[in-house]
A protein has these predicted regions:
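Key DNA-contact positions within bacterial/archaeal DNA-binding proteins
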Residues: 44
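Short, solvent-exposed loop/turn segments at secondary-structure boundaries
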Residues: 6, 118-119
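Hydrophobic alpha-helical connector segments
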Residues: 59, 70-99, 103, 116, ...
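Basic, helix-initiating cap at the start of DNA-binding domains
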Residues: 1-25, 29-41, 54-58, 63, ...
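Short linear capping/connector segments at secondary-structure termini
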Residues: 105-113
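A short, mixed-charge helix-start or loop-turn motif at secondary-structure junctions
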Residues: 1, 50, 113-117
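A short His-aromatic
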Residues: 47-50, 54
Length: 126
């Protein structure tokens, strides 16, 4: 049990470090060695959780997508006009982007068109 918790914490640390570097330097300009150093983990730990830099990008995009969907779902059925719901969603995303690099990096990856395999589901389909 403790080993699993430690593995989850290491994975989260790696994702946070990668997101910080992707956000500040860009995906293409960031190397795995820089992520390892920034996270304070070994290359073995990184490769245990992620086979390639693309897998890190995929994990960050999944978190960003899941968070965006949760925000939208929380607004659904509250009686807001379309414009007010969009404004609340935008403010919610902006608030989360200020709090940490993962969502900022996810948005940057999504808008930069970084290809990830397997592709994430399109946000406007079920």
């Amino acid at each position: 049990m403790a080993r699993q918790l430690r593995a989850e914490q290491t994975r989260a640390t790696i994702i946070g470090a990668a997101a910080d570097l992707f956000d500040r330097r860009g995906y293409e300009s960031t190397t795995l060695s820089e992520i390892v150093a920034h996270a304070g983990v070994t290359k073995g730990a990184l490769y245990f959780h992620f086979a390639a830099k693309e897998d890190l990008a995929h994990a960050i995009l999944e978190i960003q997508s899941r968070t965006s969907r949760r925000l939208a779902k929380d607004l659904d059925g509250r009686g807001y006009s379309s414009l007010e719901a969009l404004m609340r969603l935008t403010f919610g995303m902006a608030r989360l982007c200020v709090q940490g690099p993962v969502l900022r990096a996810g948005l940057r990856l999504a808008t930069a068109g970084v290809p990830v395999r397997p592709p994430l589901p399109h946000p406007f389909t079920e």
